[in-house]
Amino acid sequence: MIGVFDSGLGGLTVLEALVRRFPDQSFVYLGDHANVPYGDRPSEEIVDLTRAGVEHLFNAGCRLVLLGCNTATAMATRRLQQSWLPNEPRWAGRNVLGIVAPTVEAATRTPWAVTTPQYPQNMNDDLIFVFATTRTIDSRVYAEEINKRCPKVRLVEVACKGLVDAIEGGDAAAAGRIIEGVCRDALAAAGGERPDRVILGCTHYPIVADRFRAHLPEGVRIFSQPETVADSLDDYLKRHPDYAGRNDAPAVVQVLTTGDPMRVTAAGRRFWSEVPAFAAT
């Protein structure tokens, strides 16, 4: 069984992609809606909340947990992998993965574990736009990881303030205005140059990807995290089959929330129309 943890609803876009890609795999999703949003919280609190969510999923029987949230990934993944799990014997054989790594791998076409800069020759001075939340942009996780692999790539990062709230609130008009503004800002920062690729660095953004596409030059490749994460997990499970678990029982998809299940279910169906009803933790 594989777990997916998010501070709210955005991770449902990842869960939907995973369920489509792995129809024989069981998943448990946990949304920490009692504490959303994470972006305004201190870093240590984000780490603590993420660790608590991961523990809950481990206790539910998950051996592998994906953090379906860029803020949690940026703030907590390395701490959990390097400092927490190695010192918790009860969680031996379990692992936590973030969603920044597969996104950067796909956008730069380089493996995550690099010690020296590596990049295809035709990417030497490519222009990449990154759209994400303010907290993710401020963490510099995308800038640092992309520049480590492709130091000559030109990067334009734009924080999409208020977009997550507009999406979760179902305010399409507000979301459209924000997206139009951030795309205009990115193109202005690039001097009007067409980007070679665009990263949507928030799991809420795939459901408004068409809005981004409408305000960017035609044909620009947009990296949306759900499919990228599904591709990466497919590769990971081939290399680490023990985390896939047994497939001799019917696959189950369970969704949990620390908030109000009825309210979260209604809101969640804007992200994934077929999401099961949420249950309280």
Question: PLM features: residue spans?
Answer:
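Non-catalytic structural scaffold of enzyme domains
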Residues: M1-T281
